[in-house]
Design a protein with these regions (language model features):
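Outer-membrane beta-barrel translocator domains and adjoining extracellular loop/strand segments
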Residues: 1, 31-37, 98-106, 142, ...
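Surface-exposed extracellular loop regions of Gram-negative outer-membrane beta-barrel proteins
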Residues: 1-11, 16-17, 23-27, 91, ...
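Proline-centered helix-kink/hinge sites
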Residues: 4, 14, 29, 64-67, ...
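Residue-level signature of outer-membrane beta-barrel architecture
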Residues: 8-12, 24, 67, 77-79, ...
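Membrane-embedded beta-barrel scaffold of Gram-negative outer-membrane proteins
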Residues: 11, 17-21, 44-121, 140, ...
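A surface-exposed, glycine/aromatic-enriched loop/edge motif typical of exported proteins
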Residues: 26, 32-46
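Gram-negative outer-membrane beta-barrel transporters
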Residues: 85, 90-94, 111-194
């Protein structure tokens, strides 16, 4: 598999740069090693042909999922502020053969979705109002969807939102950097909303 990344950046001035790009990626096959790792139909036939008795309490399942292929298109800006910075980005991601590991009550079922996509935006802001105080806020806002997933453990779930992918994630923190008796340290208070 050959993947690529192509990006362009333009410096508007000393404080602002804008960029855009496209990237592809690959994730190798995955194996289900949970207690629900049942052999598929061809594996059961092979076991029986080899003289291995088929267990009556086992069912035909999915032991592995094929590889994923991803493509991401992104545009954004990096802005330096007098006492910090702001990064913002818009993106559109598509994954063909998305590896879904779905909880089914007693274990997990591994399967490939036809396609899963997510578009959205993210930001990262750091501001230091005083020399020893840093304020940080970052966020990601997604619209994830199974574009095509006809072979899930629950039937055709195309058009639904994948589980365990939050649509909104916001992180904030306040950091106090201090020096006391020759010791450097910091105290941080942070919060995650998802």
């Amino acid at each position: 598999n050959i993947d690529y990344t192509f990006k362009l950046t333009y410096a508007v001035n000393e404080a602002v740069s804008i960029y855009g790009g496209i990237s592809t990626g690959f994730k190798a096959s995955a194996w289900n090693i949970s207690r629900n790792s049942d052999p598929n139909a061809s594996e059961v036939a092979g076991l029986i042909a080899a003289g291995t008795p088929a267990s009556p309490n086992r069912s035909v399942g999915r032991r592995y999922a094929g590889p994923e292929e991803a493509e991401v298109i992104e545009i954004g800006a990096k802005i330096y502020l007098p006492s910090g910075y702001l990064n913002i980005a818009l993106f559109d991601q598509t994954i063909e053969g998305f590896q879904s590991n779905t909880f089914i009550g007693t274990g997990f079922a591994l399967a490939n979705a036809g396609a899963q996509s997510a578009d959205g935006y993210e930001f990262d802001l750091v501001y230091s109002p005083l020399e020893n105080i840093d304020l940080m806020m970052s966020g990601t806002f997604l619209d994830p969807v199974y574009d095509s997933f006809t072979g899930s453990s629950f039937g055709d779930i195309s058009g639904t939102t994948p589980s365990n992918i939050p649509e909104e994630t916001i992180t904030t923190s306040v950091t106090w950097n201090w020096n006391m008796n020759g010791w450097d340290g910091y105290t941080r208070l942070s919060h995650l909303y998802s």
